Amino acid sequence: MVADRKLSEAELFQVVGAGWKQHESEKRKKTFQEKLKGKPVFSMFLLFLIVLGCVFANVVANHDPSGFYLQNLNTPPGKEFIFGTDSLGRDIYSLIWYGGRVSLVIGLLGTAIITVIGVTYGCISGTAGPKVDSVLMRFTEMCGSIPTLLLILILSAVLQADDVISISVIIGITGWFALARIVRSEVRQIRNSDYVMYARLCGGSFGYVMYHHLIPNFVSAIMFVVISSISSCITMESTLSFLGLGLPADVISWGSMLSLANKALIMNTWWVIVIPGVFLVITLMCITSMGSFVRSEVNNHYSNL
């Protein structure tokens, strides 16, 4: 039939205009390689391998991470100890996977706390009146002006944080200020929308409006900050442990492994510093790469509206 015939180039130009070539390419089903184009595939693959190794650390590790092999102190990388041993005789290869598990848990838990506090606080400030909004934002700016590391050090000393949960909570409650400002800005743009006003008029509670109408409309805008918070939490834990103010020595993390750096420099045992540092840097770079990809996708989405 005539309706089923294929349009010529001239007829297609009349239908969709000068962009007929783009229209024709969009109609064609994309191949697997085209779907992966522009995506941080290598970063996602590396991060997947690291996370997989940390999750199944008991399978990947070939030595007891808490074992002290006193006959092999500061042994360089070799057949028995793939990544060598530290000054306490512990197998670095096994410590990497068990320590990565702790660091990733702190990163995810701290990010969850940052997200919950930042989103809730930003929604309250964005929907509140001018006076309440001004007070809430001044408080955020005041807290944000204090160096984050200083706040964490003060809270760690006061609360005597020395376990994974408490360290994650402290990092979380001191890192939500930037996210709250972004959420507040997004909420103020949509708070007078018809669907939000209708939900309020129908008696919808603040929690209902926030969960069903506010968050779905700005979640894409905060994904970069949320993903970047994972690397920030891991970095902060490593910094605290490196300074001797984080997790105790018996709790293995990448940061606590790097806390032996001063001894390693004196004794010229480079593998004690380099190997945990490489895993930490690769993980942070992969997370940052994924966050940058999400931000570029969001920017492209808004620029095409």
Predicted features by range, described:
Residues M1-F45, S289-L305:
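Transmembrane alpha-helical segments of polytopic membrane transport and secretion proteins
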Residues D4-S8, G53-S87, L243-I252:
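Hydrophobic alpha-helical transmembrane segments of membrane transport/permease proteins
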Residues K27-K35, H63-T111, S259-G277:
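Periplasmic/extracellular loop-to-transmembrane helix junction in inner-membrane transport proteins
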Residues A57-V60, I106-E141, L153:
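Transmembrane-helix boundary motif in ABC transporter permease subunits
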Residues I82, D86, I92, G126-R181, ...:
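Generic hydrophobic transmembrane alpha-helix motif, especially the helices
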Residues R90-V105, L109, G129-M137, R191-N192, ...:
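Amphipathic cytosolic juxtamembrane alpha-helices at the membrane-cytosol interface
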Residues A157-L159, V187, M236-I275, F279:
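Glycine-rich helix-loop "coupling/hinge" segments at transmembrane-helix boundaries
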Residues D163, T174, I227-S228, T269-L305:
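C-terminal transmembrane helix and the adjacent membrane-cytosol boundary/short C-terminal tail
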